[in-house]
Amino acid sequence: MGGCNHPIRLGTLCGVCGMEIQEESHLFCALYNTDNVKITHEEAVAIHKEKMEALEMQMKLILVLDLDQTVLHTTYGTSSLEGTVKFVIDRCRYCVKLRPNLDYMLRRISKLYEIHVYTMGTRAYAERIVEIIDPSGKYFDDRIITRDENQGVLVKRLSRLFPHDHRNIVILDDRPDVWDYCENLVLIRPFWYFNRVDINDPLRLKRKIEKEAGENKALEEFVSKRKKIEDIRNPEIASRLDDMVLESSCGSEGVEDDSRSTEEKEVSEVQSVASGDSELLKVAGFLRKVHRKYFASKQRNVKRILRKIRRRVFGGDRFFVAEIANRAWLVKTIEMYGGIVGIPESGVDFVVSSCEREAEYLAQKFECLAVSPKWIADCVYSLKRVEYGKYVVCDHRTKDEYEEELERLFT
């Protein structure tokens, strides 16, 4: 490496001797709050092994925790609703609702897991949120990584946090796609309170970045507005115009206005469901179960434990998924939880469709049950095969299959 064997890099410079390192090598981001400081992969693995051994001695696992829709819901703008927290970053207003039982879960789980926050929000946003849910720093310390330090990508990877050996790491997130359906993932039902908008949705952020990249004209107009503001001598007028420009830029992010009143009924329904949310209580119990199984096992591998639990959900059931909006999510999720998707030679057990006419046609064709996609979601979030009675769209099973099902249920 150009005559320098030191393990630390600051950009293209050695962090110890200052020598410029021209040739590239396999480096690892050493810190959470920046991706500019790196160490060699060998050094990272050595540090990681030492840390993992210390955690094993403490009988602790690692929990990588998402924020948005996992433990809270954030919207732009203000709200008069009780139990919400408001703050401002760069003149954009945010309103946050914490998921019920969050503090209980953190108190219980922090005794068994070292918790790391991994969010697609910005560094400023994440730090403000953490101040709200962990003001003393006892749960997260400085273990926070955001999209600002995520090496320019809008997906999450355990390799960004840990260079080696992920067998003792559990992920808690509402988005399996962001993790590319990683085997360490525990999926939680998304938490919605104000509306159904995820302000830090990676797909939305990607579209925004692509849009901004091609808006040179809009950028020029923005700069022009700023220049006019700077030319005005009256500070009160300048401040007001500045606010107008910022409101305009924040508007594309989803700042809500009086038009929200047209959605009051839907929002009220979402809040009614959210107020009775008990998902974090269930998750706390499940994470304790995983912890117990891990330290009782000789192999000690979280992925193996989670894989076994997940595959019991659909346990070899055969599915045909219709062409619907969220088909990719359904197919990958069904397979991840032990189902078989396609048209196996042995037949089909379930057709999944939200269209009644299509479900009727396919169920007749395959002589099987047709269920709504909601059944798949509820099974996955419950980590068990829930009774499908209320999710059935139509039933075209043969008599023999129907009698076998009755026998299974009542014997």
UniProtKB/Swiss-Prot annotation:
It is found in: Nucleus. CDD domains: HAD_FCP1-like. It catalyses: O-phospho-L-seryl-[protein] + H2O = L-seryl-[protein] + phosphate; O-phospho-L-threonyl-[protein] + H2O = L-threonyl-[protein] + phosphate. Keywords: Cobalt, Hydrolase, Magnesium, Manganese, Metal-binding, Nucleus, Protein phosphatase. Its EC number is 3.1.3.16. It is an enzyme of class 3 (hydrolase). Pfam families: NIF. Signal peptide: none annotated. Its cofactor is Mg(2+); Mn(2+); Co(2+). The active site is at residues 66, 68. GO terms for cellular component: nucleus. GO terms for molecular function: metal ion binding; RNA polymerase II CTD heptapeptide repeat phosphatase activity. Residues 309-393 form the BRCT domain. Residues 56-212 form the FCP1 homology domain. SUPFAM superfamilies: BRCT domain, HAD-like. Monomer. Processively dephosphorylates 'Ser-2' and 'Ser-5' of the heptad repeats YSPTSPS in the C-terminal domain of the largest RNA polymerase II subunit (RPB1). This promotes the activity of RNA polymerase II. This is RNA polymerase II subunit A C-terminal domain phosphatase. It comes from Encephalitozoon cuniculi (strain GB-M1) (Microsporidian parasite).
